């Protein structure tokens, strides 16, 4: 399986399932091959209350928009053969529910105050689900050799905050790998530097003409990892089309399938290492 196939066959289905699981009743989840559901990532407003209390109303709105759609923010899945866990975090149904509030003053990252500054609204969202993710990983993914973290849109930014926390504080003994789709910038340059020291593998898939990865604006905010640019399509009269997760899949499918054939570790799930990239 090449790097592009890994994104299409493993990470895209995981990111898509993070949306599917919020439906009632939940349809059969199309998880990546070999993975079984550990459980849904559930929001806990009580645990997020301290962060909500100090957040500006506009930043509280970002979390409230997520909760209003569903208390389920994604899922954790487990491949028992390869000892690989997936954490997948959803965004909102439309970007208009939060993007107007994306311009926020960065604040200290609560799970590690020395790590730097992050987006206030994205942090409030993460505080809603931090304990749920930690519990699912510890109870359902014991002995993990590999942890893959993904998310689309707002979920991509929250995945960045989650990935750092897993590496720094969860005590699982493995640095997660991040593969996000259409994620906005999550932190300031100091957080990006701290993130890079802990997370050696982070690929951000970005579709040409998608506005969401362009916000919040630099220099106050800076992207983490390496950007993989795809051309999934856009429509001049529909700004959101370029942001759809299915549009991203279309862009990935246009890339050469033979790009980057890395060694397997663990067996049967490749380690992407040679994805063609452009710097953010």
Where do the model's predicted regions map?
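Non-catalytic, mobile gating and regulatory segments of ester bond hydrolases
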Residues: 1-150, 154-280
């Amino acid at each position: 399986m090449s790097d592009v196939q890994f994104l299409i066959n493993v990470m895209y289905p995981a990111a898509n399932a993070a949306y599917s699981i919020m439906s009632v009743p939940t349809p059969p989840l199309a998880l990546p091959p070999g993975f079984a559901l550990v459980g849904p990532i559930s929001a806990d407003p009580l645990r997020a209350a301290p962060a909500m209390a100090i957040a500006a109303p506009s930043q509280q709105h970002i979390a409230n928009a997520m909760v209003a759609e569903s208390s389920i923010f994604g899922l954790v899945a487990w491949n028992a053969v390869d000892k690989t866990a997936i954490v997948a975090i959803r965004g909102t149904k439309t970007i208009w529910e939060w993007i107007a509030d994306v311009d926020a003053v960065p604040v200290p990252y609560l799970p590690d105050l020395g790590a730097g500054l992050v987006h206030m609204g994205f942090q409030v969202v993460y505080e809603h689900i931090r304990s749920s993710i930690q519990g699912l990983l510890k109870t359902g993914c014991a002995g993990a050799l590999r942890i893959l973290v993904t998310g689309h849109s707002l979920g991509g930014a929250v995945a960045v905050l989650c990935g750092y926390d897993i590496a720094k504080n969860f005590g699982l003994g493995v640095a997660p790998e991040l593969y996000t789709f259409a994620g906005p910038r999550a932190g300031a340059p100091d957080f990006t530097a701290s993130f890079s020291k802990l997370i050696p593998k982070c690929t951000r898939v970005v579709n040409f003409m998608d506005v969401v990865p362009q916000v919040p604006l630099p220099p106050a905010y800076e992207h983490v990892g390496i950007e993989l640019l795809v051309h999934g399509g856009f429509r001049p009269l529909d700004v959101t089309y370029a942001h759809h997760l299915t549009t991203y899949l279309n862009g990935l499918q246009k890339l050469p399938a033979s790009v980057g054939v890395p060694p397997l570790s663990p067996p049967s799930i490749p380690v992407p290492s040679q994805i063609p990239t452009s710097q953010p």
